[in-house]
Amino acid sequence: MAAATLSFGPEREAEPAKEARVVGSELVDTYTVYVIQVTDGNHEWTIKHRYSDFHDLHEKLVAERKIDKTLLPPKKIIGKNSRSLVEKREKDLEVYLQTLLKTFPDVAPRVLAHFLHFHLYEINGVTAALAEELFEKGEQLLGAGEVFAIRPLQLYAITEQLQQGKPTCASGDAKTDLGHILDFTCRLKYLKVSGTEGPFGTSNIREQLLPFDLSIFKSLHQVEMSHCDAKHVRGLVTSKPTLATMSVRFSAASMKEVLVPEASEFDEWEPEGTTLGGPVTAVIPTWQALTTLDLSHNSISEIDESVKLIPKIEYLDLSHNGVLVVDNLQHLYNLVHLDLSYNKLSSLEGVHTKLGNVKTLNLAGNFLERLSGLHKLYSLVNLDLRDNRIEQLDEVKSIGNLPCLEHVALLNNPLSIIPDYRTKVLSQFGERASEICLDDVATTEKELDTVEVLKAIQKAKDVKSKLSSTEKKVGEDFRLPTAPCIRPSSSPPTAVPTSASLPQPILSNQGIMFVQEEALASSLSSTDSLPPDDRPIAQACSNSMGSLPTGQVAAEDLRDLPGAVGGVSPDHAEPEVQVVPGSGQIIFLPFTCIGYTATNQDFIQRLSTLIRQAIERQLPAWIEAANQREEAHGEQGEEEEEEEEEDVAESRYFEMGPPDAEEEEGSGQGEEDEEDEDEEAEEERLALEWALGADEDFLLEHIRILKVLWCFLIHVQGSIRQFAACLVLTDFGIAVFEIPHQESRGSSQHILSSLRFVFCFPHGDLTEFGFLMPELCLVLKVRHSENTLFIISDAANLHEFHADLRSCFAPQHMAMLCSPILYGSHTSLQEFLRQLLTFYKVAGGSQERSQGCFPVYLVYSDKRMVQTAAGDYSGNIEWASCTLCSAVRRSCCAPSEAVKSAAIPYWLLLTSQHLNVIKADFNPMPSRGTHNCRNRNSFKLSRVPLSTVLLDPTRSCTQPRGAFADGHVLELLVGYRFVTAIFVLPHEKFHFLRVYNQLRASLKDLKTVVIAKNPSARPRTQGPLAGGQPAKSRVSAEQRLQETPAEAPAPAPAAAESAAEAPAAAEASAPAGAPAPAGAPAPAGAPAGAQAPAPAQAEVPAQYPSERLIQSTSEENQIPSHLPVCPSLQHIARLRGRAIIDLFHSSIAEVENEELRHLLWSSVVFYQTPGLEVTACVLLSTKAVYFILHDGLRRYFSEPLQDFWHQKNTDYNNSPFHISQCFVLKLSDLQSVNVGLFDQYFRLTGSSPTQVVTCLTRDSYLTHCFLQHLMLVLSSLERTPSPEPIDKDFYSEFGDKNTGKMENYELIHSSRVKFTYPSEEEVGDLTYVVAQKMADPAKNPALSILLYIQAFQVITPQLGRGRGPLRPKTLLLTSAEIFLLDEDYIHYPLPEFAKEPPQRDRYRLDDGRRVRDLDRVLMGYNPYPQALTLVFDDTQGHDLMGSVTLDHFGEMPGGPGRAGQGREVQWQVFVPSAESREKLISLLARQWEALCGRELPVELTG
């Protein structure tokens, strides 16, 4: 044998004799158990046996080994549990066991060895059991390449037995030959050795202290050891040539114990292949193939020089040790992945000199405070710094410039509790912020927007600090202490101070990227005129998108957004067509100007000039006001002073436009006549200093602009006035400029040159300021409450402006400016939403999370779709004559308020499940002290389920092209209503589309889809959304908004997922030279002859759709005649060929590269509505299963939603499309598939009750086809194999293979979806239920089910009506009876989430008849094709349904009743499946003939 050549040392002494002692007994129930202690050398263990076990052992030994029959003490029946008998028997049994051990001193018989647990604890028994196991399964294990797990005790037993030098088969049983083990270990590749921490089993054996030798393994590629003492493990070094992966856990105190066990024998050693620098005692071979080493969870305190022996290592895991310093890793040139988490590292100085090529570095759970040592790890891709002590944000700068870094984790550091922690950290990465995944959370669009703002803020601060450094001395000489003008350097950060635990809303500054073309072309913002440090700001967003030529940023960004027609150059001079009636009156902020900030020196110089001119014009009024305030302060009381200030304020505020030049000259001449010029100048200077806190000359020459805010402004002074504005915050006050409405659609140069000064006021005239809506609307009250400015802009800029304004006031003055009516900067939009929903008593309002809020105008008005004879809907929309303002007044205000109300913006606030429409009250704010819950009552809320909100598919044929339409107008379909949303801020439309599409895609279960009535009117082609979201159709219409004080209930069974209306295939196949279809106009920036953007189907493989798929879907698209249909389903059923594929991709598909695989018509039942069976068109794709449902389900669930939005109207009735409900079950959510008896139906089960649906195909062929296609699709969803070699991942590749095999009627698919088929137990349950309902089950022979089919019972219609309704039934045919049952298809078998059994039984017997009582069978085509009428003789003596009286078969309204006079009972049954129908007739005729001796009469009727 192979063992003959093995030698582990001299032969050991003879083994000590084994002993077995009975040390006690226990009474268990009614019998006694004897406790036996077995000793084998130093090892001992305890076992328990009752007397009957001894008796069985003795019988087998007598039979096999012929021992003395009287050796075992006799059995006693009476008094067997008496104490005296038990004690005597203990002694006798101990003598018996000792005798057996002496009889068999070397090798115990097999039965005795198992009785004494030798196979678990004794050396020979352990090796014999292992050898027998490998004899039977060894080849199978080696062939499968699976991991073989072995215990240290087994390895110890093998080592000990080899060292004893005994024969390899001492027992004489060839199966237990030690050679089987050695043959197996020589070829094994994947080994796992797992010990235990404490004693093993009932023994005193501590496995972690047992020595063993691994040199018997000759071909190891991968080994894992845990809870073994590395000092006692020998022979592992013999696997150096082949071992590629090694894991040693809970076993080592140093790396040398594992990598250089020879180090304990040699003082000086060097790795093989290195140049020897001095005397050494040994040259040790390296680990030639080792690339992965896991030494985690040990007690390693240093990375010693043993790493020199693993030069090819790529993956090194030293986590959960005690490493203090990163050292010696410079020898690992191939190291790519290093895990040093949860050690004791406190410094990383010089770590880049030791980790040159590392891509993944895990430093979590250490004591790190500084990251400066990481700044040169240029190859780093993944960095984990969780659970450290990093406090300063500046530390992130050390890794901010690493060019390859993609994933960073900083959670559970002191740094992570900073407000806006994510955006501030991301801003440290500069232009690469979009590529960084922070804390395992992908960077969102809103975070990138905030990062851009923070970068711009930082750049502005840098520029500001440079400018202030040159003028600091001048400013200090002339600034008075009473009016701090310049924001102190110690002011807090101005980013949005929201809580880190609350999701921030979408920050609306993305529009900066849309003005880069104009900004670069403008003479005011040309990069040539900017300082070198400022040039990156003007192109920040452009650079972040790549080095694109000028003019392409806006167009390409717009093309990537669903709902956007295309990018339009701001300089494009094409005439605008009014998108909605009265749209010329709409006030909006153009996006061509928001790129001009306080860092643009030319722009700032122009603003300074305008402000200086305005101050000179307003100087007399300010001087007069200052003088009067001084006099009032000294002579009059507080009330008179307020009255005079009010009079003065009326004369000095809101001066519009530049004054006449002649007036200025005349005024100047009059002043010279009244006073001496020098005295007047002195008086003006002193008064201005008193009023503004600044020297006049310095003010006029050095106006310091702190912040420029482009915004939408609502000014309330008795009446409401709205205009697009530019607010300029200076160190003395605030200046307001208006963008003339007629100029808002021009180029940026035109807009900037036409800026009109409105008014300005010093800081001292500001009485209150705060947020009407946190992060959305800032309010400034100027001197008197009726003069109020409502500032609407994006959150980041508003907070920046608010923070800069606060810094202009001393802390003691801020308390006077805070308002109890307004919110402070510390309140988040999420908190405001929670308070608002609580005020309106919305259920679950505290759980709602704001995903974005957008100011819009909402318009609704009637429009009529006029269809031509050719069926072309494009361009045939007639708008009712109305103006925008009147439309908004009618829709948004009560009739009594319509005359007083102006067209003011609303806010669309998106949450995960709802679209919230918020209307704010912009009436004059009350004075201080009159706060009485005004901030709650001043908002009106209307909520619409997001599942009912769609982008209007008719948008392409109703909305003209143009910059205004592209950037501000979006048409929605809310329920059955058409609503036009006009966004007042730039780029907000595109943010809304991004968030809307993400939320729609995340909705579960039910969603609303649009199905075009005519292929020519299908939703237009749109580009894919960035981030892989599905394309959506656009919106067009004017709709009146109605408000409801409470939330509208969401449709059950669940909310809807996104309606993915991808482009139609007909457009995809258009030739390159063909003009773009009317529904998909080419982008404005493209040449006139250019083709429209490639539709979504261009993403899928070229062979899709194949001709076979087109043909099969056409053949399968045949709706059964018995299923009720609605117009939308009728339309689908009429489609043929490629039109079906087009419908799927234009209206149903979720993602761009999704492919349709199968189509099925069936009725379905949902878990939440078990009593409702509804028709559905089932579409199986590569991503999900879609159920397009009958409109009856919508009516069933929409009763509580019959509000303004959900009432059908002429707009919808005349529209070129249908609105349908679609249930979506994503394949990733699918957990199990239950197949019904005889394949008559199947149930798809997800993770929740809303994701359980049963398809009642009532046809085994249809069920089989669907399941076959489903398995094929699921197979394509299997996880892709690891790119590493197979040998690297033996845990997953060679683990437990339990998929793809049928066990207990369950098939675990390779995708982990469980397919459950009917078991014999299920058939037995059905048989039992039927048998129990029979009159005398005992007298009847055993039932044998011949046929089980899902059918319908035709109910006899009332007179004057058409064909009777169908009632679902289960028809069961046995050898002698036929039954009709009511079956629960949806609740059984119980889903895993079910906590209690259903209220209904699975089967309820409705009727039963004997086959011999069947008189004849009638087959006709009226009212249903080939419906069967089974005519029975109603005999009195039949033994079925004995408990049911004849009244059961009497005439009842809508019931089956009797067919006529006489003693006959008729069952009118409709079987949809022709195959099942023929099988029923065939089996019924055969059984009837066997029972009655003649052929069954089958008659054909009309």
Swiss-Prot record:
GO MF annotation: an example: identical protein binding
Amino acid composition bias (Low complexity), ranges on this chain: 1045-1101
Region (Necessary for binding to phosphoinositide-3-P): 1-134
Region named Interaction with PAK1: 246-867
One of the record's GO cellular component terms: cytosol
PANTHER family tied to this protein: NISCHARIN, NISCHARIN RELATED
Protein name: Nischarin
Residues with Phosphoserine modification: 542, 544, 547, 1282
Residue segments, region Interaction with LIMK: 659-867
Annotated domain remarks: Both the presence of the PX domain and the coiled coil region are necessary for its endosomal targeting.
Designated gene of the protein: Nisch
Annotated Gene3D superfamilies: Phox-like domain, Ribonuclease Inhibitor
Subcellular location: Cell membrane; Cytoplasm; Early endosome; Recycling endosome
Organism of derivation: Rattus norvegicus
